[in-house]
């Protein structure tokens, strides 16, 4: 029941590049970002603290860092453009913020795909925040 509530809340807040991020994850990792990565480990989902728990959680940590480096941008709302060329995602457009956000999302989706074998829902799905108290490493 708690999972359904979280999914409903997340869907209400999805706009702009968050929906595009979901589409990139589905395209590259062949899984739903909102379902599989919205409440995983210490960094996948809203916020993030502590140390990444595994390679999948590290994808989210690096993604958070990437968004943090996109100064002057609004990564969760900046709508970007991308295309597919020879099976690769190519971020486009003239706006540097939107292109940077696209590159962050693309890198995370590729990271999820490349680390599918580390995804451990029994241990890290709905991981309690109290287990994420270690000092975080720098971006």
From Swiss-Prot:
Q: Know the name of this protein? A: Acidic phospholipase A2 Tgc-E6
Entry keyword Hydrolase: yes
Q: Which SUPFAM superfamilies match?
A: Phospholipase A2, PLA2 (SSF48619)
For molecular function, the Gene Ontology terms on record are: calcium ion binding; calcium-dependent phospholipase A2 activity; phospholipase A2 activity; phospholipid binding; toxin activity
- InterPro entries in UniProt: PLipase_A2, PLipase_A2_Asp_AS, PLipase_A2_dom, PLipase_A2_dom_sf, PLipase_A2_His_AS
Chief subcellular location: secreted
**Keyword terms:** Calcium, Disulfide bond, Hemostasis impairing toxin, Hydrolase, Metal-binding, Platelet aggregation inhibiting toxin, Secreted, Signal, Toxin
Organism in which the protein naturally occurs: Trimeresurus gracilis
Gene3D superfamilies per record: Phospholipase A2 domain
């Amino acid at each position: 029941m708690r999972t359904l509530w979280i999914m409903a809340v997340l869907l209400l807040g999805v706009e702009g590049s968050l929906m595009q991020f979901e589409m990139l994850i589905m395209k590259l990792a062949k899984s739903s970002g909102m379902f599989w990565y919205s409440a995983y480990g210490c960094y996948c989902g809203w916020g993030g603290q502590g140390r990444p728990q595994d390679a999948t959680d590290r994808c989210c940590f690096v993604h958070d860092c990437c968004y943090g480096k996109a100064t002057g941008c609004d990564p969760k709302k900046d709508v970007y453009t991308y295309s597919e060329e020879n099976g690769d995602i190519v971020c486009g457009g003239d706006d540097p913020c939107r292109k940077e956000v696209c590159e962050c999302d693309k890198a995370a989706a590729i990271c999820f795909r490349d680390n599918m074998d580390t995804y451990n829902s029994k241990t890290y799905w709905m991981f309690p925040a109290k287990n994420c108290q270690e000092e975080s490493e720098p971006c």
